[in-house]
Amino acid sequence: MANGHRSQIKRERNAVKDTRPSAKLSYARVSVQKACFVLDAIRGKSLDEALAIVMYNPRYASSIIEKLLKSAAANAENNNGMDPSKLYVEECYANKGPTMKRVHPRAQGRAYRIEKRMSHITVVLNER
């Protein structure tokens, strides 16, 4: 049997909320593999360094991740009262989202399936 009453269990679960500033983008129109190329480059870096890497990266995913970094930094400053100069990228990951299926007509009546993949990208910052 459970150790406590249902409301007490809920209270305890809600007490251990993650207070780190973060930003999440769901249904980003970029595949997980392509997003991870950029995310691997910025993981563990300071916020300024990560923004510099992302700004000069030619990949499409980097433009999305740049907005996410700026959003997470604004969340840290406004919601958590953190100093932007001390922030660094603690966690960043991309999870698989849904896939849109499209048909590409080919020769002699054939049709190839095109899969347009999506991902859910999360960036978590913290102070050093």
UniProtKB/Swiss-Prot annotation:
GO terms for molecular function: rRNA binding; structural constituent of ribosome. GO terms for biological process: translation. Keywords: Ribonucleoprotein, Ribosomal protein, RNA-binding, rRNA-binding. GO terms for cellular component: cytosolic large ribosomal subunit. The keyword Repeat does not apply. Residues 1-20 are annotated as: Disordered. The keyword Ribonucleoprotein applies. Residues 9-20 have a biased composition (Basic and acidic residues). This protein binds specifically to 23S rRNA; its binding is stimulated by other ribosomal proteins, e.g. L4, L17, and L20. It is important during the early stages of 50S assembly. It makes multiple contacts with different domains of the 23S rRNA in the assembled 50S subunit and ribosome. NCBIfam families: rplV_bact. Part of the 50S ribosomal subunit. Belongs to the universal ribosomal protein uL22 family. This is Large ribosomal subunit protein uL22.
